[in-house]
């Protein structure tokens, strides 16, 4: 069958299916309760409470989505636009928006490498959800496998594929422009998760059934190109994450992007730049009416020639500040341009930039538009203003940290969960000042209600001797005073005892010393033997242990220096 015929038949089948869906939709409308259509209240008997484990509140409109493209729900349009994505994409090239996106993308990219491979400790890590649990060798192997999977965005390494840094940069742009992040998860024939690829969020929509209601189970998402559904996905096959969710019943699960919220300000910024640009591109003349009063000698032909010369020579950049020459009785110019000086122009632009930056949670100074305070950036020198470093850190805490948390939740929900429920993805490191602030908080806690050993226990360290105390000078001083009072009390008791001894003349009975335990060896010298010498029949006279030892301390049965004769004592006399 020729390709053109196959394509034509495919279009015809699609049209038939759309027609059938529309007929089912109309039939459903006819079957809607007349109480709803006529806006009549329900009777109390027909109202059921959510006591059976089911939600009774409506999460979708009672009348389903009526769209020219049945099968999916589009985003609510603004300014009568049929496709909100196209409107957002049109203003997605705004210079302020791209400055914000590029700044945040570059900041996020600093966290897209494993922290254990970074010298600064900045990056991401895969760890156990249970902080107190010790990872086994199997857990460590799985953690390394997940890190490798994230780095390559697949089980295998392919230089033509996006790495995790590129994936996160695409994610930041998608969420800042459309507040919708989509990527497809690919599985092999055995159901194993092998890779994930980013998908254009402007082509992904929520699927609807024949009644125009959102599908809760099964193929909940569709991809639409040229107003035709080209692919369908279930919850496991496609990730659908939003950063600014809404409970609006007309919106469904679509997010609320900052670009849509500040669309009026973005349009005003574009118009302001165009207005200022035309001042240079269309010459330096202002808008107004040139009134030429011709004399009797002037003809209409000469006036037409002057008009053509004006338009040709004074228009464009090369015609700026040119002086026209005309011969007439009188020439007047009526200025129709409102007076707007450079200061007003600057304040208006500063206001737009500050409002847009505030909506994205970023300090204008991060995109090289320093703000001296106030909506127009004209105030400064306030005592409440911090230095530039503190303002930068506050800006990142307000905008960058929530963005990193959104990426963490997305990766954990749609990627890491495929490897088990016991693992968790999180970013680590960051600005050193933030870490110093955490240490200061711990230090203050250690001075009020936490002991040193409690802090060490939270950090996974062993307790130390003397660490069961808070690091508070007042508390330590109180402990020292208590010890000092104990010492004084002991000194007083000793003084009282000494005075009693003096008054009694030394007759106060002293506590008898402890008698040593009976010796089990007869050769041991007892305390009494040492003190009294045991004069008499005892073999241990003078405390000797062995009778074979002489008074000089030498053995009697052995030759020694005292038993050997010296000098002439050993020579026999003849």
UniProtKB/Swiss-Prot annotation:
Membrane-spanning intervals of the chain = none
Q: Which residues form the signal peptide?
A: none
Compositional bias (Basic and acidic residues): 543-559
| UniProt-annotated location(s) | Virion
Q: Name one GO molecular function term.
A: DNA binding
Record-level GO cellular component terms: viral capsid
Q: Does the keyword Hydrolase apply?
A: no
Grouped into one coarse class, the protein's main location is virion
* A UniProt-annotated Pfam family: Phage_portal
Q: Which GO biological-process labels does this protein carry?
A: symbiont genome ejection through host cell envelope, contractile tail mechanism
In residue numbers, the region (Disordered) covers: 504-574
InterPro entries reported for this sequence:
Phage/GTA_portal (IPR006944)
Q: Which UniProt keywords apply?
A: Capsid protein, DNA-binding, Viral capsid assembly, Viral contractile tail ejection system, Viral genome ejection through host cell envelope, Viral genome packaging, Viral penetration into host cytoplasm, Viral release from host cell, Virion, Virus entry into host cell
Q: Where along the chain is composition biased (Polar residues)?
A: 522-535
Q: How does it assemble?
A: Homododecamer.
UniProt lists the family membership as follows: Belongs to the phage portal family.
Function in brief: Forms the portal vertex of the capsid. This portal plays critical roles in head assembly, genome packaging, neck/tail attachment, and genome ejection. The portal protein multimerizes as a single ring-shaped homododecamer arranged around a central channel. Binds to the terminase subunits to form the packaging machine.
- Its protein name is Probable portal protein
């Amino acid at each position: 069958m020729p390709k053109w015929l196959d394509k034509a038949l495919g279009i015809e089948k699609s049209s038939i299916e759309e027609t059938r869906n529309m007929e089912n939709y109309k039939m459903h409308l006819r079957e809607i309760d007349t109480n709803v259509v006529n806006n009549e209240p329900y009777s109390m008997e027909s109202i059921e409470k959510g006591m059976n484990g089911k939600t009774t509140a409506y999460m979708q409109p009672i009348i389903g989505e009526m769209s020219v493209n049945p099968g999916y729900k589009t985003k609510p349009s603004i300014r009568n636009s049929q496709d909100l994505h196209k409107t957002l994409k049109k203003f997605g090239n705004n210079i302020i928006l791209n400055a914000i996106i590029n700044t945040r993308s570059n900041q996020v990219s600093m966290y897209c490498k494993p922290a254990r491979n970074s010298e600064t400790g900045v990056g991401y890590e895969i760890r156990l959800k249970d902080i107190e649990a010790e990872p086994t060798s199997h857990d460590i192997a799985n953690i390394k496998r997940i890190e490798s999977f994230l780095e390559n965005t697949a089980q295998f390494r392919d230089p033509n594929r996006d790495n995790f840094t590129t994936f996160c940069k695409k994610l930041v742009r998608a969420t800042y422009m459309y507040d919708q992040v989509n990527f497809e998860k690919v599985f092999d024939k055995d159901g194993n998760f092998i890779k994930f690829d980013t998908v254009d969020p402007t082509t992904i929509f929520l699927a609807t059934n024949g009644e125009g209601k959102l599908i809760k189970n099964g193929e909940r998402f569709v991809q639409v190109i040229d107003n035709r559904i080209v692919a369908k996905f279930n919850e496991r096959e496609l990730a659908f994450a939003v950063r600014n969710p809404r409970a609006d019943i007309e919106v469904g699960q679509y997010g609320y992007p900052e670009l849509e919220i500040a669309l009026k300000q973005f349009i005003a910024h574009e118009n302001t730049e165009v207005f200022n640009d035309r001042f240079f591109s269309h010459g330096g003349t202002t808008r107004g009416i040139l009134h030429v009063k011709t004399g009797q000698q002037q003809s209409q032909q000469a006036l037409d020639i002057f008009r053509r010369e004006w338009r040709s020579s004074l228009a464009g950049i090369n015609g700026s500040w040119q002086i026209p020459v005309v011969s007439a009785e009188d020439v007047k110019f009526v200025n129709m341009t409102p007076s707007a000086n450079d200061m007003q122009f600057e304040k208006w632009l500063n206001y737009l930039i500050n409002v847009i930056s505030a909506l994205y949670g970023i300090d204008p100074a991060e995109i090289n538009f320093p703000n001296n305070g106030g909506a127009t950036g004209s105030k400064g020198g306030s005592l409440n203003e911090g230095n530039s470093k503190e303002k930068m850190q506050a800006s990142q805490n307000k905008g960058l940290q929530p963005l990193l948390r959104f990426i963490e939740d997305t990766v954990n929900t749609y990627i890491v969960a495929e490897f088990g429920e016991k693992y968790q993805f999180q970013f680590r490191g960051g600005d050193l000042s933030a870490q110093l602030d955490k240490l200061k908080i711990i230090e203050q806690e250690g001075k009020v209600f936490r002991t040193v050993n409690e802090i060490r226990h939270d950090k996974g360290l062993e307790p130390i001797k003397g660490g069961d105390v808070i690091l508070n000078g007042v508390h330590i001083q109180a402990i020292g005073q208590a010890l000092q009072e104990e010492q004084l009390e002991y000194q007083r008791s000793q003084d009282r005892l000494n005075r009693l001894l003096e008054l009694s003349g030394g007759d106060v009975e002293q506590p008898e010393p402890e008698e040593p335990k009976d010796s089990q060896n007869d050769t041991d010298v007892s305390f009494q033997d040492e003190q009294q010498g045991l004069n008499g029949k005892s073999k241990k006279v003078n405390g000797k242990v062995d009778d074979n030892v002489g008074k000089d301390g030498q053995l009697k049965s052995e030759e020694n220096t005292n038993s050997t004769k010296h000098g002439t004592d050993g020579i026999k006399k003849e």
